């Protein structure tokens, strides 16, 4: 299926969406990469990632793209959920055959409430959605895909949760999706050099911090690692393919959780 992965347009002053672990309003402009959308996008050949806020794509411009795709995957956040629902409805009005999936923290915590918010949402995927979205785009029925919640016979069907992804090396490099679909010069964070690239070297965090979004709503508490070789190779590729790049940032929940692994990677 032709698939659009969307970090939707947001209201002015909102620093959130597909890449932010702390969705909030802000006083200065900053943008994180939509990294969670880019992993499954790398698994689907006929896909595109649209990160609307940093690329200054309006709601109307976004909605107009609906006719070009068969599947919309929208990463939503709690502050932006109501606006995201309206955007999905606009796109469904333009292309009634468009299948719409919502992913992100709100749908993990309250999947039924999310589906009740709009009939434009066909299904939601809880927590890690990389392979669930790939499988649907490749033709699997919703009833066969773990972690999916959808409407069926006037009720909601909750499929069993998928196990966490253990083999992180099997996932695509998000840097290649950045190169394909995003302008890396548009991303900035005040405490990082500009321009920068960020990606993950691990998923999950054993800590129980209440202020951090991802372990509770997306990646879980089991700490899983990419191999050092895979990380180093992606770093090399990134440096070769993004002229002028000044920093690579590892946005892990707990990068230095294991001392020996940190030393191995840094050496």
Question: Predicted regions span which residues?
Answer:
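Short glycine-rich His-centered loop
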Residues: 1-31
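Short beta-strand segments
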Residues: 4-7, 51, 73-78, 102-103, ...
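Short, glycine/serine-rich, charged loops/turns that create anion-binding
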Residues: 10, 54, 107, 204, ...
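Short aromatic-enriched loop/helix-cap "lid" or pocket-rim segments at secondary-structure transitions
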Residues: 14-19, 114, 161-162, 171, ...
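Conserved alpha-helical elements of sugar-nucleotide-dependent glycosyltransferases
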Residues: 29-39, 230
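Glycine-rich beta-alpha loop elements in corrinoid/cobalamin-binding modules
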Residues: 36, 40-167
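N-terminal [4Fe-4S]-dependent radical SAM core
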Residues: 142-145, 151-198
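Radical SAM [4Fe-4S] cluster-binding motif and immediate context
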Residues: 174-267
């Amino acid at each position: 299926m032709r698939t659009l992965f969307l970090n939707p347009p947001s209201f002015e002053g909102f620093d959130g969406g597909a890449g932010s672990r702390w969705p909030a309003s802000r006083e200065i402009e900053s943008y994180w990469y939509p990294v969670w959308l880019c992993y499954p996008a790398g698994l689907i050949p006929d896909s595109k990632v649209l990160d609307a806020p940093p690329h200054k794509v309006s709601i109307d411009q976004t909605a107009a793209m609906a006719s070009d795709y068969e599947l919309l995957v929208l990463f939503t956040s709690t502050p932006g959920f109501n606006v995201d629902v309206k955007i999905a409805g606009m796109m469904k009005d333009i292309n009634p055959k468009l299948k719409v999936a919502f992913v992100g923290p709100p749908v993990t915590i309250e999947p039924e409430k999310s589906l009740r918010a709009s009939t434009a949402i066909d299904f939601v995927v809880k927590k890690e959605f990389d392979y669930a979205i790939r499988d649907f785009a490749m033709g699997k029925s919703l009833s066969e895909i773990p972690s999916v919640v959808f409407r069926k016979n006037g009720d909601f069907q909750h499929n069993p949760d998928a196990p966490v992804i253990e083999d992180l090396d099997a996932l695509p490099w998000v840097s290649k999706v950045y190169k394909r679909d995003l302008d890396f010069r548009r991303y900035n964070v005040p405490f990082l050099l500009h321009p920068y690239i960020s990606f993950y070297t691990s998923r999950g965090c054993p800590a129980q911090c209440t202020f951090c979004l991802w372990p509770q709503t997306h990646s879980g508490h089991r700490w899983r690692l990419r191999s050092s070789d895979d990380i180093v190779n992606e770093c090399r590729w990134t440096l070769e393919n993004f002229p002028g790049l000044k920093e690579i940032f590892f946005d892990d929940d707990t990068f230095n959780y294991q001392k020996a692994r940190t030393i191995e990677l840094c050496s």
